[in-house]
């Protein structure tokens, strides 16, 4: 599939909009009214610290909405203002945040339904308005919407587009794309659609498994069974792992992505030698700045001698999950919640989601005496939600 030709056709159709409809000033004003918080602004100005009574709060120095998310949410809202009466669809949630998506639902912006991972575009009529979310859409979806003559509003984060360009470069030069990500995540599904031959690896353990195979250790049938849902059609590890390039889902843990990239470079050096490395490995730089900043800030926050840590963000948010992993790896009691309503002031309890688990209720969430609470939030979490959480902590400790 000539993905570049399809993109060019879509983007030059006259029914494609990547810039939005309002000025930056209008956009900032609209977002500020919905999602900004005076409390959070004052905490930022006070070196990200807040104290009241026995409660001390320390915010991460980088948290919450990133530029790409702000842009996507603002464009979605202004699309409804620009098209007040038209049917408006999204190919998926605009971002992984329940409050934002519920707000859009109340504005009658609908998500295209899916069953068993297959989207049903039959409800989308010719000329309808369709929003592509921050983590993008597959090239096949773009082509289908183009053929339906839909008005396409593309809010894809530029960092995600950069990954697409990377895997297209791999394809052009007949390199297989090794994608560090979750093979079912919406962003990785989109990236896969732009790649040629690809293999998705979730973590360093899977990278080591692939490396061992490249070096001649492993069983082909076992390999294909392990990666059956995470590789391109017709993938042959004996052929398609001779020339590889690395890319990533932008919300993965930065340190792990870097480690996987270096690991595969070392693997190809060992197999083919320094003189031939450029024929067998392509270096990469697709780590998102915002993801990197939030993870670095989290690594600093966990050194603040905290009693507990609250991580705020959608439960299906990959970047938020990785912030939670950092807390756990530093042995800090942490609680991942998506909305402030998970905290009960009356009962001093929190309903939170541990990694790889269902929601559980923690009673006596805030102990007696002085307490220092660290707080961070994922890139899809508005300041207002963080402020609501802080207000509940204040109420519990009064």
Swiss-Prot record:
Active site: 187
Enzyme class, broadest EC rank: oxidoreductase
Binding site for isopentenyl diphosphate: 96, 185, 317-319, 380
Biological processes per GO annotation: dimethylallyl diphosphate biosynthetic process; isopentenyl diphosphate biosynthetic process, methylerythritol 4-phosphate pathway; terpenoid biosynthetic process
Molecular function terms, GO-annotated: 4 iron, 4 sulfur cluster binding; 4-hydroxy-3-methylbut-2-enyl diphosphate reductase activity; metal ion binding
Catalytic reaction(s) noted: isopentenyl diphosphate + 2 oxidized [2Fe-2S]-[ferredoxin] + H2O = (2E)-4-hydroxy-3-methylbut-2-enyl diphosphate + 2 reduced [2Fe-2S]-[ferredoxin] + 2 H(+); dimethylallyl diphosphate + 2 oxidized [2Fe-2S]-[ferredoxin] + H2O = (2E)-4-hydroxy-3-methylbut-2-enyl diphosphate + 2 reduced [2Fe-2S]-[ferredoxin] + 2 H(+)
Pathway(s) this gene product operates in, as recorded in its UniProt entry: Isoprenoid biosynthesis; dimethylallyl diphosphate biosynthesis; dimethylallyl diphosphate from (2E)-4-hydroxy-3-methylbutenyl diphosphate: step 1/1; Isoprenoid biosynthesis; isopentenyl diphosphate biosynthesis via DXP pathway; isopentenyl diphosphate from 1-deoxy-D-xylulose 5-phosphate: step 6/6
Binding site for [4Fe-4S] cluster: 66, 157, 288
Keyword terms: 4Fe-4S, Iron, Iron-sulfur, Isoprene biosynthesis, Metal-binding, Oxidoreductase
Co-factor: note: Binds 1 [4Fe-4S] cluster per subunit.
Cofactor(s) essential for the protein: [4Fe-4S] cluster
Entry EC no(s): 1.17.7.4
Residues that coordinate or bind dimethylallyl diphosphate: 96, 185, 317-319, 380
Listed InterPro entries: LytB/IspH
UniProt-annotated binding residues for (2E)-4-hydroxy-3-methylbut-2-enyl diphosphate: 96, 185, 250, 317-319, 380
Pfam hit, one: LYTB
Role according to the record: Catalyzes the conversion of 1-hydroxy-2-methyl-2-(E)-butenyl 4-diphosphate (HMBPP) into a mixture of isopentenyl diphosphate (IPP) and dimethylallyl diphosphate (DMAPP). Acts in the terminal step of the DOXP/MEP pathway for isoprenoid precursor biosynthesis.
NCBIfam families registered for this protein in UniProt: ispH_lytB, PRK13371.1
Family: Belongs to the IspH family.
UniProt name for this protein: 4-hydroxy-3-methylbut-2-enyl diphosphate reductase
Gene: ispH
């Amino acid at each position: 599939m000539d993905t570049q030709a399809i993109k060019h056709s879509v983007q030059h159709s006259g029914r494609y909009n990547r810039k939005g409809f309002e000025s930056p000033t209008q956009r900032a004003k609209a977002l500020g009214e919905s999602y900004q918080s005076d409390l959070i602004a004052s905490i930022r100005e006070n070196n990200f610290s807040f104290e009241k009574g026995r409660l001390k709060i320390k915010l991460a120095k980088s948290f919450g909405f990133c530029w790409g998310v702000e842009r996507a949410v603002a464009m979605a809202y202004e699309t409804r203002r620009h098209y007040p009466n038209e049917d408006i669809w999204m190919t998926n949630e605009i971002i992984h945040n329940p409050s934002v998506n519920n707000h859009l639902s109340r504005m009658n912006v609908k998500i295209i339904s899916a069953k068993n991972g297959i989207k049903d575009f039959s409800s989308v009529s010719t000329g309808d308005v369709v929003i592509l979310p921050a983590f993008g859409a597959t090239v096949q979806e773009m082509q289908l919407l183009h053929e339906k003559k839909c008005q396409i509003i593309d809010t894809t984060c530029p960092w995600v587009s950069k990954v697409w360009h990377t895997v297209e470069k791999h394809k052009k030069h007949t390199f297989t794309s090794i994608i560090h990500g979750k093979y079912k995540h919406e962003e990785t599904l989109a990236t896969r659609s732009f790649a040629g031959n690809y293999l998705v690896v979730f973590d360093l353990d899977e990278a080591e498994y692939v490396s061992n195979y490249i070096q001649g250790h492993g069983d082909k049938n076992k390999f294909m069974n392990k990666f059956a849902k995470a590789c391109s059609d017709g993938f042959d590890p004996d052929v398609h792992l001779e020339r590889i390039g690395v890319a990533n889902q932008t919300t993965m843990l930065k340190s792990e992505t870097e480690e996987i990239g270096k690991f595969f470079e070392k693997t190809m050096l060992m197999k083919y030698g320094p003189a031939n490395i450029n024929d067998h490995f392509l270096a990469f730089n697709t780590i998102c700045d915002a993801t990197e900043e939030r993870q670095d800030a989290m690594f600093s926050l966990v050194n603040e001698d905290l009693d507990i840590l609250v991580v705020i963000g959608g439960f299906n948010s990959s970047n938020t999950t990785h912030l939670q992993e950092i807390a756990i790896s530093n042995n800090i009691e942490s609680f991942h919640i998506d909305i402030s309503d998970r905290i009960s002031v009356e009962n001093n309890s929190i309903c939170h989601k541990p990694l790889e688990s269902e929601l559980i209720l923690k009673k006596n969430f805030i102990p007696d005496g002085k307490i220092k609470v660290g707080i961070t939030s994922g890139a899809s979490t508005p300041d207002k939600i963080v402020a609501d959480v802080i207000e509940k902590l204040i109420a519990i400790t009064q």
